[in-house]
A protein has these predicted regions:
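Phosphate-binding P-loop
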Residues: 2-8
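Hydrophobic anchor at the beta1->P-loop junction of P-loop NTPases
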Residues: 11-13
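The conserved Walker
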Residues: 17
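Walker A/P-loop
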Residues: 22
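ATP-dependent small-molecule kinase phosphotransfer cores
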Residues: 41-114, 121-125, 141, 145, ...
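Phosphate-binding beta-loop-alpha motif at adenosine-nucleotide cofactor sites
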Residues: 132, 184-201
């Protein structure tokens, strides 16, 4: 199915670290012509610059950064280090920082008719009225292996134990934080990626949900 010009589709994709949400969200965005945004990269971008520049006032510093942020700046391999991952969970607890990034994401979503944003609080906080809310789940060992393969492209010395530990800490912090914790939206569609045979199976499941929604909304 090809979406028509008048079709409006807003998708939220949430889940823990390396659960498959980024891959799934990117692939269905490409398939259906959706504007894609990773909220995780926004937080990593914020962490990277706070650690690099150590500003006196984090909030005013980040406001300026996000007022001029282009999505091309998010394509930075250094954003994916374990150090950045750990720091990201720390700043994610800060409501003022979350508000800056929330405003950026909402503004992004309002610019387009067809949007997919992935993260950890998209379906519950950023896009609570999304047409479709996907929630990705994955066994921690499998998720850690996925992340290890990704990280070893730039850091051959990193180990499975390090990655798994960092991911466990990250997920626990995200679930337990006071502000916008990682929780499954009530009406979310579960995508259990470790139970699916391959990426094609994941895309097929998501596509079926999307096309059924479009047919209900606009007719066959």
């Amino acid at each position: 199915m090809k979406l028509k010009k008048h079709h409006k589709l807003v998708i939220a994709a949430d889940g823990g670290a390396a659960s498959g949400k980024t891959t799934g969200a990117k692939l269905i965005s490409k398939k259906y012509g959706l504007q894609f945004l990773s909220s995780g990269l926004l937080y990593r971008f914020a962490s990277y610059h706070l650690l690099k520049y150590k500003p006196k006032n984090n909030i005013s510093f980040l406001k300026k950064k996000f007022n001029t942020l282009s999505l091309k700046k998010l394509n930075n391999k250094f954003l994916h280090s374990p150090k950045i991952s750990a720091h990201t969970s720390i700043i994610a607890k800060n409501q003022k920082i979350r508000n800056i990034l929330k405003a950026f994401q909402i503004k992004f979503a309002k610019k387009f008719n067809k949007v997919c944003i992935e993260g950890r609080d998209i379906g519950t906080v950023i896009l609570p009225k999304a047409d479709i809310k996907f929630f990705f789940k994955c066994n921690l060992n499998i998720a850690a292996k996925r992340r290890l393969t990704e990280l070893q492209k730039t850091n051959k010395r990193i180990t499975f134990v390090e990655v798994k530990k960092a991911m466990r800490i990250r997920n626990n912090l995200d679930k337990k934080r006071k502000n916008s914790p990682l929780i499954q939206a009530e009406n979310a569609v579960i995508v259990q990626t470790d139970k699916l045979k391959n990426i094609e199976g994941m895309v097929s499941k998501m596509s079926k949900t999307i096309e059924e929604r479009i047919k209900r909304k606009y007719g066959a």
